Regions:
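Beta-rich catalytic cores
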Residues: 106, 130, 149-152, 170, ...
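Blade-level signature of beta-propeller repeat domains, shared across WD40, Kelch, NHL, RCC1
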Residues: 314-351
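Short glycine/acidic-enriched loop and turn motifs that connect beta-strands
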Residues: 41, 124-128, 171-172, 211-212, ...
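Conserved beta-propeller blade signature
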Residues: 117-121, 163-166, 203-205, 244-248, ...
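Ser/Thr/Pro-rich low-complexity tracts
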Residues: 1-119, 131
Length: 351
């Protein structure tokens, strides 16, 4: 490529806008993406137009070689194009998460049963009794009340038999919940119980956000497994494909960490540099996905096994995620649930 081509953009020698990439390649409505290319800004200080399918998105920043645009409500997965001076660029696919339920209050990952039904909390503020604690969203995205008698339902997990467990940060208890929505106490006395996760042997791990990870054996014996820096909100737990427990817990720092905890309870820093990291999940290749901020941008951050982090989904107010059938993901914000066709195979939570 010659100097003039580099200045003009190799594929923009005819003066038309050209898109080379969109980063990140997935977003929720309201999330911002960076469109990279050439000829993207018209002359005379006018702004380009950005279309996500049939819906126009707001332009936040525009330059000749990039445009930052906000994904509008109503956008769906499909091509984004940039228009300048009557010329329209090539299309470049952006995957847009589709809203499936709102008026909720999840504070951690949603959970899916073996049939693909989604379970999500309406957690409420500390000590607030709400009419419905957990909602069930079926495969047709019909939302129905599932559990009504729990204060501050926080984290949800299923064991290998399909039994549902829920933590309550109000009373430090983990409850078993039957398919008909009746509940019974499984383990008590765990402080401010937040995140929960099962290991391969079906021991249950519970994060008390004041600084302790508890391990509950299948005989219901409770052990102190590890101690961590306290969190201002909650611990979130997930096991890697190698069977190593990973924990996030937002603090007052803007440079928070992901912890790894080995089988002996020894705590290490797996990654440092996230803002308010919350729910987390692994794919089958060992990449870790965290609802967090990276470099001031909120969304889903992917951390590779060798420690490289990048924002792969843009979206405000994300608190958690769960991989779903069909190489997709369920994304939870502070008030809603979205479905994203992502092309990523999630790790089974009990393998």
């Amino acid at each position: 490529m010659g100097i003039s081509d580099r200045l003009l953009g190799k594929k923009n020698v005819n003066g038309k806008p050209h898109i080379e990439a969109v980063v990140p390649a997935a977003a929720l409505p309201g999330g911002e993406v960076r469109i990279i290319g050439s000829g993207l800004k018209p002359p005379e200080l006018r702004r380009p137009r950005v279309q996500f399918g049939e819906v126009e998105g707001a332009v936040v920043i525009a330059a000749d070689d990039f445009v930052i645009a906000r994904v509008p409500d109503g956008a769906v997965t499909g091509p984004v194009v940039v228009s300048t001076n009557g010329s329209v660029s090539n299309g470049h696919e952006v995957r847009v998460a589709a809203p499936i339920a709102e008026n909720l209050h999840p504070v951690a990952n949603p959970a899916l049963d073996a049939e693909g039904n989604i379970y999500v909390t309406f957690s409420g503020s500390r000590g607030q009794k709400v009419p419905v604690s957990i909602y069930k969203i079926d495969t047709n995205y019909a939302v129905k009340p599932f559990l009504s008698d729990m204060m501050n339902a926080t984290a949800i997990a299923f064991d290998r038999a399909g039994q549902l467990y829920v933590s309550s940060r109000h009373d430090g208890t983990v409850y078993k919940v039957a398919p008909n929505g009746t509940m019974s106490s499984y383990a008590e006395g765990m402080g401010v119980a937040t995140g929960i996760a099962f290991d391969r042997e079906e021991n249950l791990y519970v994060g008390d956000r004041t600084g302790t990870i508890f391990k509950i054996g299948r005989d219901r014996q409770i052990y102190v497994y590890a101690t961590l820096e306290p969190s201002v909100s909650a611990y979130h737990l997930a096991f890697s494909p190698a069977g190593v427990l990973h924990v996030t817990g937002p603090t007052t720092s803007s440079y928070d960490v992901v912890y790894s905890v080995d089988s002996h309870g020894t705590v290490s820093v797996s990654y440092r540099g996230l803002g308010r990291p919350q729910g987390l999940a692994f794919d089958v290749d060992g990449n870790l996905y965290v609802a967090a901020s990276l470099g001031g941008k909120r969304g889903i951050v992917r951390i590779t096994p060798d420690g490289k982090a990048s924002l792969v989904v843009s979206g405000q107010n994300l608190v958690g995620l769960a991989f779903a059938p069909g190489r997709s993901a369920i994304l939870a914000t502070q008030s809603a649930i979205h479905h994203l066709s992502w092309g990523i195979q999630g790790k089974s939570l009990l393998d």
